[in-house]
Amino acid sequence: MTNLNYQQTHFVMSAPDIRHLPSDTGIEVAFAGRSNAGKSSALNTLTNQKSLARTSKTPGRTQLINLFEVADGKRLVDLPGYGYAEVPEEMKRKWQRALGEYLEKRHSLQGLVVLMDIRHPLKDLDQQMIEWAVDSNIAVLVLLTKADKLASGARKAQLNMVREAVLAFNGDVQVETFSSLKKQGVDKLRQKLDTWFSEMQPVEETQDGE
């Protein structure tokens, strides 16, 4: 297994939808989560870069698909945050369409990291993301973020509860706790990404450009 240097991750581009993304080759691992789940903080902690992914003070600001390259043909994808109450309904629907389309049609997408606040896990949209991924044979890592907000016993109880709940999806779904503040769970995240990037088959360029 290759240990990638995530500190070398750099921003490639932003796209409003799947049609504007670069060619569907290599391996992509996407990060998804509700607008306040700590997605940007997790990406910044993973790569040890303070501002790789912009942490917005206004949840719901990240409306684009953001691509980052870790190494040649190995990319991390920051998907638009979902479920923020103050975003207009029309925009919410647009994002959900873009998310669904990306998860179902992007062949190079081979792993999905779903981030949830450990205090409020498995909301409807979180479950929908996991369901979409499992239906598309995409491996899932659930990160229960802001784990430092709970005492050790409560943290363990939440972890066990979510691990039990995801069995119902009948897919490759792993659950771990994570804290950007305390750097907790970062090694497990890196190990999982290394495994995915090492063991999964990169998508090659096709003649018709699909």
Curated annotation (Swiss-Prot):
GTP binds at residues 33-40, 60-64, 78-81, 145-148, 178-180. Belongs to the TRAFAC class TrmE-Era-EngA-EngB-Septin-like GTPase superfamily. EngB GTPase family. Mg(2+) binds at residues 40, 62. HAMAP family: GTPase_EngB. This is Probable GTP-binding protein EngB. One of its GO terms (cellular component) is cytosol. One of its GO terms (molecular function) is GTP binding. Residues 25-199 form the EngB-type G domain. It comes from the Bacteria. It comes from Shigella boydii serotype 4 (strain Sb227). GO terms for biological process: division septum assembly. Pfam families: MMR_HSR1. Keywords: Cell cycle, Cell division, GTP-binding, Magnesium, Metal-binding, Nucleotide-binding, Septation. The lineage of its organism: Bacteria, Pseudomonadati, Pseudomonadota, Gammaproteobacteria, Enterobacterales. Necessary for normal cell division and for the maintenance of normal septation. Transmembrane segments: none annotated. Its cofactor is Mg(2+). The gene is engB.
